């Protein structure tokens, strides 16, 4: 559309594709390479599979949610399944942490401030007859406002630490705002 009316627009039109937009790194490389030098204005768009083909959705302000990525590493003490009293099983702690994280959206966020917390990957254990000494939870938080985003980050860290402590484990949280 813009190309068809280029003679009516003063200045130069640049069409760009931002690589690595999901992790918010592509724009930095593009700026470092000078792609945006001399640009006076910009209109950005994002492909959204939920929007029917041929339709465009325009709104003032932010349109897509901010994306954060978290990784929780839970540490207990591994050992043989025949000797559970000598171990600190990280797997039940992982399960409890996942359940406790569900309260972030249902009980801690203002219901008119959309926020999604997703646990997308869990790993624990190395063998069928060994109590797991470590577990990992990986997920994402999507938010539309900074207050909810801040609250979610604080909650993920607090829940991970407190739940781990209640299971005699420790939790290390890596939380990246992408």
What spans do the regions from the language model cover?
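Metal-dependent amide/peptide-bond hydrolase catalytic core
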Residues: 92-178
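Histidine/acidic-residue-rich, glycine-tolerant segments that coordinate divalent metal ions
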Residues: 2, 7-132
């Amino acid at each position: 559309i813009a190309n068809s009316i280029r003679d009516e627009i003063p200045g130069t039109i640049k069409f760009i594709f931002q690589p690595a937009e999901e992790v918010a790194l592509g724009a930095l490389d593009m700026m470092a390479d000078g792609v945006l030098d001399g640009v006076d204005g910009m209109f950005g768009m994002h492909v959204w599979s939920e929007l029917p083909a041929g339709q465009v959705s325009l709104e003032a302000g932010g349109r897509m949610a901010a994306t954060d990525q978290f990784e929780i590493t839970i540490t207990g003490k591994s050992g043989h399944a025949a000797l559970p009293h000598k171990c600190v099983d990280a797997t039940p702690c992982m399960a409890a942490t996942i359940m406790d994280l569900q309260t972030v959206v249902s009980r801690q966020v203002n219901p008119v401030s959309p926020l999604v917390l997703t646990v997308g990957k869990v790993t624990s254990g190395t063998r069928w007859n060994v109590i797991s000494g470590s577990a990992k939870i990986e997920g994402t938080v999507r938010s539309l406002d900074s207050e909810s985003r801040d609250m979610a980050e604080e909650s993920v860290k607090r829940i991970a630490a407190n739940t781990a402590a209640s299971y005699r484990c420790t939790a290390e949280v890596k939380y990246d705002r992408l």
